[in-house]
């Protein structure tokens, strides 16, 4: 929180720290939320968090409207960080993902070892859970491939759906826009029609997600990882 930052940095006042953290948030390096998953934020105050780079800051930096085009090396860094740190470790990840990265699971059963595509009706569970806090942004992986001149040429478009506090964060930092439940379902249906694979985030336990991706093999870093390292 700003109060905690001020305690550790007494040379700066709260207004300065708030402005500085907002700027860093807009860059995508840090994220903010109002959650109480750790039990330390019962009043749901705004808190900032330094994400892991992949999945995390890298994707957010890519969906920044101007930053990644202005600094194309961020696309190179994203691509390499979605590969190099994973070699030698990813091969040991069991089917189901073990709570790492992205995964495709049936929401109703939430069996970690399960590995199959998510039917569109299962995704409606998450959209109903977070209704009123749903957003959409361009696909970070497709944008990365476009900047790098690689991939299958899939149009980056608005394919990445954010939910909960992450959707609010994206709206407040100009990384995305709010959409309704019905609009989200339309995006998912279009993805189904194109043969894309639905993936949900898999790093916060079975009761929370922050995003739904509509992925294609020729552009998605997560699907590439599963193929290169044989981790379904």
Predicted segments with their positions:
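Compact structured core domains
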Residues: 174-203, 214-216
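Ferredoxin-like iron-sulfur electron-transfer modules
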Residues: 48, 201-207, 227-232
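Short amphipathic alpha-helical interaction segments
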Residues: 10-26
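Short, amphipathic alpha-helical interaction segments positioned at domain boundaries
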Residues: 38-86
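Local cysteine-cluster metal-coordination motifs and their immediate loop/turn environment
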Residues: 137-145, 209-223
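Short acidic, hydrophobic short linear motifs in intrinsically disordered regions
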Residues: 1-9
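A short, conserved structural fragment
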Residues: 25-39
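Long, Pro/Ser/Thr-rich low-complexity/intrinsically disordered regulatory tracts in eukaryotic proteins
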Residues: 72-179, 201-204
């Amino acid at each position: 929180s700003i109060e905690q930052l001020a305690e550790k940095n007494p040379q700066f006042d709260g207004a300065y720290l708030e402005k500085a953290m907002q700027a860093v948030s807009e860059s995508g390096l840090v994220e903010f939320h109002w959650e109480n998953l750790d039990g330390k934020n019962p009043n749901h105050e705004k808190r900032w968090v330094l994400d892991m780079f992949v999945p995390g800051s890298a994707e957010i930096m890519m969906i920044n409207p101007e930053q990644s085009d202005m600094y194309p090396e961020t696309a190179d860094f994203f691509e390499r960080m979605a590969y190099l740190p994973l070699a030698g470790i990813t091969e040991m990840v069991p089917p189901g993902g073990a709570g790492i990265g992205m995964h495709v699971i049936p929401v109703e059963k939430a069996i970690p070892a399960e590995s199959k595509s998510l039917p569109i009706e299962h995704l409606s569970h998450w959209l109903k859970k977070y209704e009123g806090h749903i957003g959409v942004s361009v696909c970070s992986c497709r944008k990365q491939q476009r900047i790098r001149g690689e991939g299958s040429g899939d149009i980056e478009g608005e394919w990445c759906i954010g939910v909960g506090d992450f959707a609010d964060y994206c709206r407040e930092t100009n990384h995305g826009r709010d959409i309704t439940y019905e609009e989200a379902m339309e995006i998912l249906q279009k993805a189904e029609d194109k043969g894309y694979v639905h993936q949900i985030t898999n790093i916060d336990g079975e009761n929370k997600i922050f995003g739904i991706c509509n992925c294609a093999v020729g552009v998605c870093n997560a699907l590439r990882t599963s193929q290169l390292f044989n981790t379904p």
